[in-house]
């Protein structure tokens, strides 16, 4: 029965909207820019909650986009050892320098990824793999990067079929999970973490534009070389 305004129901672009007060998550401390990030971060929060990751766990995040980065924020809170894999080296550098992940691995699609993951993780594969790519190819191949009795968690979404041999998950006794959304408690927790300075939103807010500047600015945001992480549109 989950319904999201602007997704399942019309009204996401209304100037004014009447909602039950219990659906709102206010903060007297955060800026509007910070509040705009809460929903994005909630996807990562729920994902890490579903993974039940704990301190010292070796975790691989595949995909250094906003969803993968959101997961990273809460893996940091859980004090896990984080490796990020992506084909975009600029994004990997951002994750290393701005988000403080432990290791990065460039995806080259040459069959060396598992060995390189072992190299940076002390000879072991991660116990948890979070696939945030939304690519059915990546999601079908994620099992080769996880250790025995580990888990693969899908937070990226695809409409394509996933294909893998049963023995791929049966022999190493893997667990498969999915993470779709967030719950009200996640929003309250995220607001508190930002208010307390545990999560730094500054690296996320890479670009901003006024309402009048949005039309000429938007095409630039679509260019990879622009380095957009999250862009904020000011409506005033």
Question: Where do the PLM segments sit?
Answer:
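Short amphipathic alpha-helix with an adjacent loop that forms part of the alpha/beta core around
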Residues: 110-123
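C-terminal hydrophobic helical "lid"/dimerization subdomain
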Residues: 140-141, 184-236
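Glycine-rich phosphate/adenylate-binding loop and adjacent beta-alpha elements
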Residues: 1-24
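Short SAM/SAH-binding signature in class I
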Residues: 124-132
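Glycine-rich phosphate-binding loop and adjacent beta-alpha segment
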Residues: 136-196, 234-236
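Mid-domain Rossmann-like dinucleotide-binding core that forms the NAD(H)/NADP(H) cofactor-binding site
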Residues: 30-109
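Helix N-cap at the beta1-alpha1 junction of Rossmann-like dinucleotide-binding domains, i.e.
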Residues: 89-91, 111, 136, 159
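A generic alpha-to-beta junction signature in SAM-dependent methyltransferases
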Residues: 53, 121, 133, 146-147
